[in-house]
Amino acid sequence: MVHYDGYESETRMVRVKADEKVDFAVIEAKDGSKRRPASGSAVTRSSSDASERATYASPRRELKYVSTTAASTVVSADAPSPSDGESTRIPLADGGVIEKKAGHGVLTAGEVNDFAKWTQWQDIAGNTLSALKDLWAMAPSGRYTLDLQNKSGLPIADAVVHLKKKDGTELYSARTDNTGKAELWAALDPMAPLPKERLFMEVEYRGRTTRVDNVKPFERAVNRMVLDVPCGPSDLVDVAFVVDATGSMQDELDFLTAEMNDIIFRSKRINDKLNFRFANVFYRDIGSSEEYATRSMDFSRVLSASVNFISDQRADGGGDVPEAVDLALDSAINHLSWSAEARARILFLILDAGPHITPDVQAKIRTLTKQAAGKGIRIVPITASGTGKATEYLMRSLALGTNGTYTFLTNHSGVGNSHLEPTTDHYDVESLNDLLVRVLKSYTYMPGCDQQIPELELDYADSLV
């Protein structure tokens, strides 16, 4: 029986291997060290995305891609050890099949934080992936960063920050994250001209509005502000899983289900003072043959409720590559009951294809990005097998627009079809559940009110380098 104080308890008979007992502990493992790859474990791999390229090709111009091979390093020295569960038969190209148990710890993944590789992202977006700006009509540009602290030097989280023109027209709004930083953009539409005038910011926090004049773009400086307010961050953390449940996801959905369930229960070990709430949105596509377009469960502190909802979902439908991503994001961003005040709001977007490309959908994606940023919802895409460069670009843009990070499944697990190598220089390979728990930790950690910020090399996915 798994029981957490204040939560529903649920009794299930499970078989637990010796090395899996730690999964049921509510404390961190004694050995908190991170295993690094042995010498010579770096691998390189590249893949093509011809099917998506054909689907998303513009009728006016042929999209050409310059192949950029990324080096990946396997972080875990040992092969992942899945928990017992139902086995999944995975077809092979030669007609054979292999069986893998759909337990947690099987899927492997990597992360590209484009805030941490800002110069490289500008080069990639302006060259290798430049054609995709027009395809999606999406290109976060004119970056402005605010660092907000109190007089003790502690970060102020969840303050609302508006970026405005001198006539008061709002260009963007965002909320400060757990490090006290807010990322704002002068434009998302690549056709929109960047303002040449001086801009200002308005900061709203606990009923008080403060103005910051003559703010500088990120290329020139990080804008800093100190408020005379007491320390007292919220202990609320909202996490939503938005999952593509079309037929093309079947090869990995059982494994993703196990990973999501594991992450939900491991959240209690991150910080016992935090109150996590979980919500879910599963989506397919639009059409009379679809069982549903979106199916959701609102936020709940009952962990088993979210686990049971996820476990009941199956992949089916779809057919064409584009899916109802915009409907799913709208359902999650605007119809889930996100906390009015929170330390962090995180949306994990799991998919293998982008939305339909029409002017209305393009405009809607930009609007949804701004709405998410304004509510402090950080989008963390997780791309699965079958993803192409067009979807990769859009997902990385969504992450930038909402102060998130881009993650992706890799071939190292042997699960699913071929996974696209991201356009970057290097990434580490981790088990997916460990990577996402690390993201949760990095988005929720804050120093205590009675201490100064430690001068340490913390493994946090900060928005600045």
Regions picked out by a protein language model, each given a short descriptive name:
Residues V160, E170-N178, L199-V465:
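Divalent cation-coordinating acidic motifs and surrounding scaffolds
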Residues I156-D158, K166-A187:
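Short, acidic Ser/Thr/Gly-rich low-complexity loop/linker segments typical of extracellular
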Residues D23-A25, K181-M191, R224-L227:
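Exposed aromatic-hydrophobic patches
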Residues S152-K164, K196-E197:
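Short flexible loop/turn segments that cap and initiate beta-strands
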Residues M1-P37:
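Short loop/turn and low-complexity linker motifs enriched in small/turn-promoting residues
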Residues V2-R12, M191-N214:
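A short, solvent-exposed loop/turn motif at the edges and junctions
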Residues R36-P155, D167-G168, V226-S234:
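Beta-strand-rich domain onsets/edges
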